Amino acid sequence: MSTPLNVVALSGGTSRPSRTLALTEAILAELAEHLHIKPHLIELGEIARPLGSALWRSELPEAVEQQLRLVEKADLLVVTTPVYRGSFTGHFKHLFDLIGQDALVDTPVLLAATGGSERHALVLDHQLRPLFSFLQALTLPIGVFASQAEMADYRVSSAALAARIRLAAERAVPLFGAHHALRKSA
């Protein structure tokens, strides 16, 4: 079997449990159904305090620096953020402010977000996509937005949301060629 893809998923929520973490895990699980991956999950809540107190990358503790290096070396990056006041969180943005300017050039990024209602769904295209375009990453054409109504007990509970997650994962497969795709027996 081929070398697994290094998939790094950043769950941008700061609490646990969280719908953002649940969505991130559901996306990783679906990607694993279609691609041979080695997943790495970064929970922003676990590094938020030391991350937030650093103005410069050189001020980060080594454990947080390691997480940033994982992001920079990803073959595929999955980013999921809760939506607050129409945008991603400040800690989420601060993490990407500390990522090397050219570190994500041509890195495929699957965008995802959670929000209280569908009125936040445009955050994918109006907030996240411009951020990663600036970083010259390759944002995947299908993102995943999950509203509060589509999740129950911190799990995907909507067939429509599950279908969007599946579509996003399926659309990621061609980027990595047949040697990373998992063969499904009929």
Curated annotation (Swiss-Prot):
Q: Which family does it belong to?
A: Belongs to the SsuE family.
Source species of the chain: Pseudomonas putida (Arthrobacter siderocapsulatus)
Swiss-Prot/TrEMBL catalytic activity: FMNH2 + NAD(+) = FMN + NADH + 2 H(+)
**What upregulates this protein?**
Under sulfate limitation conditions, it is transcriptionally activated by the LysR-type transcriptional regulator, CysB.
Annotated SUPFAM superfamilies: Flavoproteins (SSF52218)
Keywords in alphabetical order, please.
Flavoprotein, FMN, NAD, Oxidoreductase
Known function: Involved in the dimethyl sulfide degradation pathway. Catalyzes the NADH-dependent reduction of FMN.
Q: If you read the UniProt record, what top EC class would you report for this enzyme, in one word? A: oxidoreductase
Enzyme Commission code:
1.5.1.42
Say if the entry is tagged with keyword Lipid metabolism: no
Q: Specify the taxonomic lineage.
A: Bacteria, Pseudomonadati, Pseudomonadota, Gammaproteobacteria, Pseudomonadales
Does Cytoplasm appear among the keywords? no
Protein's name according to its UniProt entry: NADH-dependent FMN reductase SfnE
| Molecular function via GO | FMN reductase (NADH) activity; oxidoreductase activity, acting on NAD(P)H, quinone or similar compound as acceptor
